[in-house]
Amino acid sequence: MNGNASKPKPPPSAKVQALIRNISRAERGPESRVDRPKSVVFSYWTKMLDLIGFALNSQGFQFQRIDGQSSMSQRKAALETFGGDPECNVMLASIGAAGEGIDLTSASIVHIVEPHWNPMAEAQAVDRVHRIGQQKDVYVISTYSGYKGTSND
């Protein structure tokens, strides 16, 4: 599923702002676009992926998305674009749809923005990035909401 959201944008939450800040820091990395790290953003809730997609669009990020509504051909196209396009550095993925059976080793940063009730599901999702064939160090960032507009990384 292409990550081009067209609905009106709600204001981003503190958690989404923290996520965008972290992705932006990674984007400002090496000069060569080829060397810039790719990020996978996992969420248990697809509505959260919608909100993150709005924020990424507003900041000009190119991204792909996989969730339970993605057909096999959409999943394949999203994975090929994410893995092969140096301009596409973010993959939004629901833990349920992308937690097993796919290879995301082109990424080196994993963001967990909505924890799954089963920690093993999160571990399997992280393993899509950190698996045999991975040539880079993998960083996992879990972002949890606090209160009064705060976020904890």
Regions found by a protein language model. Name each.
Residues 1-90, 96-100:
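Conserved Helicase C-terminal RecA-like lobe
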Residues 74, 89-153:
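SF2 helicase/translocase ATPase core recognition
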